[in-house]
Regions:
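Short acidic, S/G/P-rich loop/turn micro-motifs used as interaction or catalytic elements
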Residues: 9, 67-71
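Short loop/turn segments at strand-loop or loop-helix junctions that form parts
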Residues: 60-67, 98-100
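Active-site-adjacent loop/helix micro-motif of nuclease/hydrolase catalytic cores
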Residues: 40-44, 70-77
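RecA-like P-loop NTPase motor core
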Residues: 1-56, 61
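Hydrophobic packing residues within well-ordered alpha-helices of enzyme cores
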Residues: 13, 64, 77-78
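Surface-exposed acidic loop/strand-edge motifs in secreted or periplasmic proteins
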Residues: 57, 69, 81
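Activity-critical C-terminal alpha-helical subdomain
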Residues: 72-162, 166-167, 171
Length: 203
């Protein structure tokens, strides 16, 4: 079971799991749940037994952004696992913070979209147009940030950059990240996914 902190993560994971299956990774049946937030994981744990098929779950992974509050999220997850009767029956519980690991014992500080931005497929627009599109998008976001002022900067820059960039393309305008991934916006074989793939192999 994959417990996702945000809708974008929950929408992307089925696409990535399908890709891994096509690459020969034999994953058992995976249930994906959008928890919306991990502020109160204990309450989430109480509701999980009510989800159809939850009694068959043996392994759980928490998927969340490293910011804000990686340390607090990790503590909440550990407390929930230790105190929950449901989680205590699991063979395996783990967490993964996007965009991935900085070192074997440290996570990069960032967001899910930071990982996707690294893997953006440059071939999705006409040859030579990628850098122009990208630069124009960066300039647009810079103008938006300047207009918001120093007190209210854009949060999760990569997310805004991806959606603004897709709006300038014919193939991905109006799509959410999961849809864009399904239609080939990202190179799912990119090294940015290595940490996530290694974790999913353990399911």
């Amino acid at each position: 079971m994959l417990l996702c902190e945000r809708q974008e993560i929950a929408e992307f994971m089925p696409v990535y799991l399908k890709y891994l299956f096509k690459q020969g990774l034999n994953l058992s049946s995976v249930q994906i749940i959008n928890c919306h937030a991990f502020n109160d994981i204990s309450s989430i744990a109480e509701k999980l037994p009510l989800v159809p098929g939850s009694e068959q779950i043996r392994k759980t992974v928490f998927l969340a952004d490293a910011v804000p509050g990686e340390l607090q999220k990790r503590k909440s997850m550990l407390n929930a696992v230790r105190s929950s009767t449901y989680f205590s029956k699991m063979e395996y519980c783990a967490h993964f913070f996007f965009p991935g690991k900085k070192s074997p014992k440290r996570w990069q500080q960032g967001y899910f979209e930071d990982m996707l931005l690294q893997s953006l497929d440059r071939s999705i627009v006409e040859t030579g147009a990628y850098q122009n599109f990208y630069n124009l998008t960066e300039e647009y976001l810079l103008c938006v940030n300047n207009s918001r002022g120093q007190d209210k900067p854009l949060c999760n820059h990569s997310r805004h950059l991806l959606y603004a960039y897709f709006a300038a393309t014919e193939n991905f305008v109006g799509m959410h990240l999961g849809e864009a991934a399904l239609h080939g916006a990202f190179n799912l074989n990119h090294s940015a996914f290595d940490d996530l793939k290694d974790l999913l192999k353990q399911l």
